[in-house]
Design a protein with these regions (language model features):
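A short loop-to-beta-strand structural motif that recurs across blades of beta-propeller domains
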Residues: 56-57, 61-66, 104-106, 148-151, ...
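Short loop/turn segments that connect beta-strands within beta-propeller blades
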Residues: 68-72, 109-115, 153-158, 203-207, ...
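Beta-rich, blade/repeat-based domains predominating
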Residues: 30-42, 81-96, 123-140, 168-181, ...
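Asp-box/WD-like beta-propeller blade repeats and closely related beta-sheet repeat scaffolds
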Residues: 104-106, 110-135, 142
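C-terminal motif of bacterial Sec signal peptides marking the signal peptidase cleavage site
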Residues: 12-14
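A short beta-strand motif characteristic of beta-propeller blades
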Residues: 22-28, 73-80, 114-122, 159-167, ...
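Conserved beta-strand positions in repeat-built beta-propeller and related beta-rich domains
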Residues: 30, 45-59, 97-103, 139-146, ...
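Blade-level signature of beta-propeller repeat domains, shared across WD40, Kelch, NHL, RCC1
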Residues: 265-291
Length: 291
């Protein structure tokens, strides 16, 4: 089976109450170093490196994208065609799938499978292109190793604009946007966590100023809004785990996931239709549970 239900449980402690338990499913078959997920047709797309060894900056061209939906067989949506090496954050607009990769964003037309993708190159040295989020016709792309967020014109998704530097933040990784505000998960590209590696908020995209939203340092990777829009989920590599942030109070609540093999590197997560998908990059599986 593509997805196997394990004996794992999820425990989310309610404020002042007992921890609740829910079953957790692990999805592993057909995946190899899965860094990112994105909602798609009632399930998710899962981006895989496909390499023998884990290297987020590899250039082997073995990357591929799989569609997973509970109860259905897996489907390879984008095979290893040589254009993807370490695919990370994704974004979908008008049937075109934007995929972050090393020093570029690759754009596939899902309405025309097999056609050559558009490759949007980033400036030299902008290697760790990590995540994408859009506000209208502007697509934002984080580059973790240089501390920059770029903006791209996607008013015509078939002809994507040239990346333009927009804002600098220490280690920008995961991005989400809602109601005109951006939230950024910060990750140290060199593995050395500092006080600058926190969760940031940019309240006004037209006049961008990054302010710490949660000042607890970490190695933050994925970030997603909860289904009710009242919280943020964030993944952290050190310590490896998942937390939930109340947007009104900024209180941080750990989400305890008990697995036979613990999370090692939870990455670019998705929340869709009441289900949470957390890719665990080093373990090559996705942890799935209901909110």
């Amino acid at each position: 089976m593509f997805a196997t239900a394990s004996a794992a449980i999820l425990m989310l402690a309610a404020c002042g109450g007992q921890a609740t338990k829910a079953p957790v499913t692990t999805v592993g078959e057909g995946l190899r170093f899965c860094e990112s997920t994105y909602p798609y047709e009632g399930g998710v797309l899962i981006a895989n490196f496909g390499t023998e060894e884990l290297n987020p900056l590899n250039g082997e061209g073995k990357g591929y994208i799989v569609r997973y939906k509970a109860g259905e067989a897996p489907q390879v949506v984008i095979p290893a065609d040589g254009n993807l090496s370490a695919p990370k954050g994704m974004f979908l607009r008008d049937g075109r799938l934007f995929v972050c990769d090393v020093n570029k964003v690759v754009v596939y037309d899902l309405n025309q499978p097999g056609t050559a993708p558009q490759v949007v190159s980033f400036p030299e040295g902008e290697l760790f292109v990590n995540d994408l989020a859009a506000d209208g016709d502007v697509l934002y792309a984080s580059v973790t190793n240089t501390g920059r967020i770029f903006r791209l014109d996607i008013s015509d998704p078939a002809v994507v604009g040239t990346p333009e530097p927009w804002l600098e933040i220490s280690g920008p990784n995961g991005l989400v946007i809602r109601d005109g505000a951006m939230y950024v998960a910060s990750y140290p590209a060199d593995g050395q966590t500092t006080d600058a590696h926190v969760i940031y908020r940019i309240a006004d995209l037209s006049n961008p100023v990054a302010e710490p939203f949660v000042a607890l340092p970490g190695q933050y990777d994925g970030i997603a809004f909860s289904g009710d829009g009242k919280s943020l989920y964030v993944t952290n590599w050190s310590p490896a785990g998942l937390s939930r942030i109340d947007l009104a109070t900024r209180a941080v609540e750990p989400v305890a996931i008990e697995l036979e093999q613990p999370l090692a590197g939870p990455a670019d997560m998705t929340v869709a239709d009441g289900v949470v998908y957390v890719p665990d990059l080093p373990n090559s599986w996705v942890v799935v549970f209901a909110e």
